[in-house]
Design a protein with these regions (language model features):
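Conserved micro-motifs of the catalytic ATP-binding
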Residues: 122-127, 167-170
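Glycine-rich ATP-binding loops of the HATPase_c
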Residues: 261-269
Length: 286
């Protein structure tokens, strides 16, 4: 079941550069503004871009919350150590300790009231599970990206399927969004005339989708070609990553995989080298 969104009044506030939104009125007529790149952004694509941006924002907030709490807890603990070492009759020293504790408490409260509250909307990812054909999911995702961004970028998208009639009981729309984002990212990171390949397979326990592409880091920031992902997201994707972490813009893929009891992995991305994006989903919900 595909989630409905208001197509007659859809507003996309985080606009991808070099693309335009084509809105559809209640009568079915389309309107839009052609971008300089010559690419129009359909409402579905705008919706997918907005979803990717939303999950990226929440992923960044999660990192901020996690990475700040450790130092704040350490500061709080060391404040108690200092208090025992300082002269209890020294007003200046006591004011300093109170100020340190107060500052830490304010920062923790800020994380709780702003960061954690902002993330609440996507903290629990609800799934609409229905049986569907895996082969159709993959082929539809490939066609969507192939006829959209890939064609305008001169990138070919191939589909290598090891599937036949396999069915899966899951949230098709969420998984389609994850596959779209994986393919779109691979196209964004590919040079003209490059090839992106989606290989799918399944066994008795799980199904897999592995996207392979040759990374061209300069393509992520090339102003002469169209882009769907935000400039900030593409710039961050080029930065070195700590082990086990993914590019922020791929957060939706990770969340969707985990909600289905599976995993998402991003391979190392080095200029001119083959790189992979992999989705692994168990056939039976965890």
């Amino acid at each position: 079941m595909e989630r409905a969104y208001n197509e007659s009044s859809f507003q996309f506030h985080v606009l991808p550069e070099r693309a335009s939104i084509v809105t559809t009125s209640s009568t079915g007529t389309g309107s839009g503004q052609q971008a300089a790149s010559g690419v129009s952004l359909s409402e579905r694509t705008a919706h997918l871009c907005a979803e990717a941006a939303l999950f990226m924002r929440d992923h960044v907030l999660s990192l901020v919350s996690h990475d700040l709490r450790g130092p704040l807890n350490a500061i709080h603990s060391w404040a108690y150590v200092l208090e025992r070492k300082l002269d209890a009759n020294d007003p200046a020293a006591q004011r300093a300790i109170v100020g340190i504790r107060s500052g830490v408490d304010q920062q923790v409260k800020l994380l709780e009231t702003i960061v954690d509250t902002t993330r609440a909307g996507t903290k629990t990812l609800a799934l609409v599970r229905e049986p569907f054909a895996l082969q159709a999911l993959f082929s539809d995702s490939v066609d969507e990206v192939r006829t959209g961004l890939a064609r305008s970028r001169g990138v070919s998208v191939a589909f290598e399927s090891g599937l036949s009639t396999e069915q899966f009981n899951g949230d098709r729309e969420r998984l389609a969004a994850a596959l779209w984002l994986m393919l779109t990212f691979a196209v964004e990171a590919s040079a003209n005339s490059a090839k992106v390949t989606l290989a799918s397979s399944a066994d008795a326990t799980a199904w897999r989708a592995v996207i392979t592409y040759e990374a061209t880091l300069a393509a992520l920031d090339d102003a002469s070609v169209p882009h769907l992902l935000e400039p900030f997201a593409r710039t961050q994707a080029r930065a070195p990553r700590e082990a086990g972490r993914i590019a922020w813009v791929l957060s939706l893929c990770k969340r969707v995989a985990e909600a289905h009891g599976g995993t998402f992995e991003q391979g190392e991305m080095q200029d001119g080298q083959a790189s992979t994006l992999a989705l692994h989903i168990p056939l039976v919900a965890a």
